[in-house]
Amino acid sequence: MVAVPTAWCSVALALLLALQEGKGQVAAAPDHPAPSPRARGSHLRPRRCSCSSWLDKECVYFCHLDIIWVNTPGQTAPYGLGNPPRRRRRSLPKRCECSSSGDPACATFCHRRPWAEAVVVPGSRSPADVFQAGQRWTSAGELLQQLREISATKIRFARQHQEAEREPRPMYPRRRKT
């Protein structure tokens, strides 16, 4: 009778050890080769690209494939990325660098223009000219004119919104309960 519980304990222990060794490892896929035995010790995480800034949460979410996002009241915190201050500093001109040059989604994400350059500002100048780093206004009048155009656009949208709300909506007779 003593042999049966011992056998079950041995099986359970072997199963636990097998599961513990495979914990956290991603199955080998054609895009991601299986990690070498040396790499397993350092626990490399699969990622699609490498962000130039930890503060760019959208980039971190896009690039790191196996992080867990936890919603906290003030911010969304990524867990499983290690200690950000220990990461070596980079001065990348782009938002991120792709691991694979054949990944079109990554190339589109990493090399697209930042939001500030993509915003359309009323005026004759292109958005890239308006939001260029280090640019100074040639005169106070030019800045004032840009602000007036923005204000006029906001007022125009507000009036259109008010007019849309004022339009009478068709009244349908209420259905009586029977």
Curated annotation (Swiss-Prot):
Residue span of region Disordered: 158-178
Alphabetical UniProt keywords: Cleavage on pair of basic residues, Disulfide bond, Secreted, Signal, Vasoactive, Vasoconstrictor
InterPro entries, per the entry: Endothelin, Endothelin_toxin_CS, Endothln-like_toxin
Molecular function terms from GO: endothelin B receptor binding; hormone activity
SMART domains named among the record's database cross-references: END
Signal sequence extent: 1-24
Keyword Disulfide bond set for record: yes
GO biological process: angiogenesis; artery smooth muscle contraction; axon extension; cell tip growth; cytokine-mediated signaling pathway; endothelial cell migration; energy homeostasis; intracellular calcium ion homeostasis
SS bond list: 49-63, 51-59
Subcellular location, record wording: Secreted
Site annotation Cleavage: residues: 69-70
Compositional bias ranges of the Basic and acidic residues kind: 160-169
Family annotation (PANTHER family): ENDOTHELIN, ENDOTHELIN-2
Similarity comment text for this entry: Belongs to the endothelin/sarafotoxin family.
Protein's recorded name: Endothelin-2
Source organism: Mustela putorius furo (European domestic ferret)
Gene: EDN2
